[in-house]
């Protein structure tokens, strides 16, 4: 089956040659290159092309995991997409190969740690919000609706659909304000 390589550097100043050579040595027939930040999956069209078109039994080859993803969450998203398609992931410089039992276990553990990281972040955020509320600093997100503006427009005879369209809210919200739900 096909082996598809992916080489990425953060900037155009960095050289992809070493990664490309390693991917060729790993038997990659196709190599996609990207010189962009790894901060966002969506901002990496070559990676998205590979994930969209890889087939069952094919292997996605990288040199190191940090070339693929900057966060456990993003890595888990990529691994899940590959798994759903029946494709494998191999890192040439690290013991990561999802076609083996050990490699599968490695990525399953990464998934556990990604969930743990998310839960820790939520806990820290909740603690920070609670502390800010105690100090009177945190007010939450400002409300999207301007109750007074809606009521004024209703009094002027505007219809709920026009008000909703103009203010970027749902018609239901206009009806709720009219009924007094948003006091």
From Swiss-Prot:
Per the database record, which ranges form the Resolvase/invertase-type recombinase catalytic domain? 2-136
- Going by the entry's taxonomy, the superkingdom of the source organism is recorded as Bacteria
Task: Name the GO terms of the biological process aspect.
Answer: DNA integration; transposition
Entry-linked CDD domains:
SR_ResInv
InterPro entries per record: Homeodomain-like_sf, Recombinase_CS, Resolv_N, Resolvase-like_N_sf, Resolvase_HTH_dom, SSR_resolvase
Q: Which region is the signal sequence?
A: none
Q: Gene3D superfamilies from the xrefs? A: Homeodomain-like, Resolvase, N-terminal catalytic domain
Q: Which UniProt keywords apply?
A: DNA integration, DNA invertase, DNA recombination, DNA-binding, Plasmid, Transposable element, Transposition
Instruction: Report TM segments.
Output: none
Q: Name one GO molecular function term.
A: DNA binding
Q: Which Pfam families match?
A: HTH_7, Resolvase
Family per similarity comment: Belongs to the site-specific recombinase resolvase family.
Q: What PANTHER family does this protein's entry cite?
A: DNA-INVERTASE FROM LAMBDOID PROPHAGE (PTHR30461), RESOLVASE HOMOLOG YNEB (PTHR30461:SF26)
Instruction: State the protein's name.
Output: Integrase-like protein y4lS
Q: Which species is the source of this protein?
A: Sinorhizobium fredii (strain NBRC 101917 / NGR234)
């Amino acid at each position: 089956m096909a082996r598809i390589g992916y080489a990425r550097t953060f900037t155009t100043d960095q050289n992809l040659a070493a990664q490309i050579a390693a991917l060729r040595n790993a038997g990659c027939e196709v190599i996609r290159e990207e010189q962009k930040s790894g901060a966002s999956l969506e901002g990496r069209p070559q990676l998205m092309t590979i994930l969209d078109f890889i087939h069952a039994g094919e292997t996605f080859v990288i040199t190191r995991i940090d070339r693929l993803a900057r966060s456990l969450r993003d890595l888990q998203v990529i691994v899940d997409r590959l798994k759903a398609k029946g494709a494998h992931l191999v890192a040439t410089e690290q013991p990561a190969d999802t076609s083996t039992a050990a490699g599968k276990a490695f990525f399953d553990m990464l998934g556990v740690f990604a969930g743990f990281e998310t839960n820790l972040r939520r806990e820290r955020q909740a603690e920070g919000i609670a502390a800010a509320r105690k100090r009177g600093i945190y007010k939450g997100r400002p409300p999207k609706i301007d109750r007074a503006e809606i009521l004024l427009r209703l009094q002027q005879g505007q219809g709920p659909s026009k008000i909703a369209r103009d203010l970027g809210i749902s018609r239901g919200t206009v009806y709720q304000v009219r009924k007094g739900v948003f006091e």
